[in-house]
Amino acid sequence: MKKTLLIITALLFITSTVFPQSKININDLVEIDGKMYKPLSDKLYSGIVYDSYENTGTKKLDGFYRNGLKHVKWTWWNEDGGIDSTGSFKKGLKNGQWKYYYSNGNLKGKGQYRVGNDSSPGITDIPRHGRHGKWTFWHENGQKLDELTFKDGKASGLSTSWYENGIKEWEYYFIEDGTRDSVKLTTRWYDSGQKWYEGYVKTLNDTTIVWNGLNTKWYENGLKMMQGIYKDGNLDGLNTEWYENGQKKFEGTYTNGLKNGHGTMTYADSAKYVGEWKEGSKNGQGTYTWANGSSLEATWFEGVPDGNAKWIQADDDYYVGEIKGSKTDGGGWNFVLDGQGTQTWTDGDEYVGEFKDGSKHGQGTMTYANGNKYVGEWKEGSKNGQGTQTWTDGDEYVGEFKDDQRNGQGTFTWADGNKYVGEWKDDQRNGQGTVTWAGEWTGQKYTGEWKDGSRYGLGTLTYRSGAKYAGEWKDGNRHGQGIMTYTGGRTDSGVWADDKFLESRSVSSVEAYLDDLIK
């Protein structure tokens, strides 16, 4: 009898230990230092736990504790009654196979844990710590999302990702410490299946993944987008870029992610820059060529041309000299001729001198294709101020200009030696002036008023014979009241018309003028 009682007692002990009958709502347990205790007790809890949703009363979780720690199989449900996750624990740590589900019932993730502690959420918020072996993850629509292998919680080896449509998106590798493999290629595809990226990566600060080494990118149409060298996530070294139509966009060097050194940039409008770059901007010597064939060879600073330059226009007119550049509101640039320079036109004209804000301004010499020349002052692109104009036939003007015309005081000397000294207006003799003749007409002289290049008004003409006419003029002829004094002393005093004497008459209208001449 005693032996029978001992056997029964032993069986009861084993049953209570291996198959504990305790079952309690998990919310009634007390947590102390990460372990669960029975309510109002200092004993660690061992037994079944459960929980339900307050609103619906449906099951929320089912689990088991041993000595206050989660143990063996646990299952969680969502509020709609579907399984959320299920797996096993060992001494409070995830251990063995685990499955996670979306609310629609499709698998979210599946894999093995070894001493996982529920920390470090990873892909799809599934705890990362302690993953070990192959893990697979799915999109909510059931298509595979990711597949990779872990070792002691760290990714290791090949990792493959897919789009929701089932097309592969990524393929890359990890080394045993969980960082990305910098020796093996990382590849990405568009959701159409066309390759997008291919290159090498590097892990910075244990978590940041950056491109490092040779990298190639493609457009979705299959044409190359770029190919270059990265260093710690930034382009650094030779790089080539293309537009989506296959036209080359840029070829040159980068430093720390910015164009630096020599490079060729072809813009969308077919304009092109070939030259030096610094910190992403045109800087140094370079040539910019427009789509129409015009080109600017200049010194650049922070993306703007400035200083000495050579500008060749599409029609082959060109300029060599100083320019002034500026940035535009749209982020572009512009320039004007400014300073000392030489502008040459294809018709043979040439200007050498000063410019300001794009126009001839200051001192300069304009030599025309026909041989005529102007040397003097300019203002806003026109002859203004003192200057000398010479013609190939030997004529010369020295004096004042305004708006490209002779205006003010000036002296015009004809090739035959005749000379006019006096006032000008609108490129014609206008006002007071004196003409002296040379050669066979030496000694002949007119002093008086002029209008539109002709003697007009009061004036005196002294002939080379010594005869003299003093009086009124019109359109270059004696016209009106005047006195003609001949060398023999005879005089014709009266009215003249079209250079002919008509009749004797009082010349009162010119008496004051004649008095001044006598004085």
Which residues are covered by each model-predicted region?
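Sec-dependent N-terminal signal peptides
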Residues: T4-I14
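Glycine/tyrosine- and acidic-biased, solvent-exposed loop/turn segments at the edges of beta-strands
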Residues: S16-K519
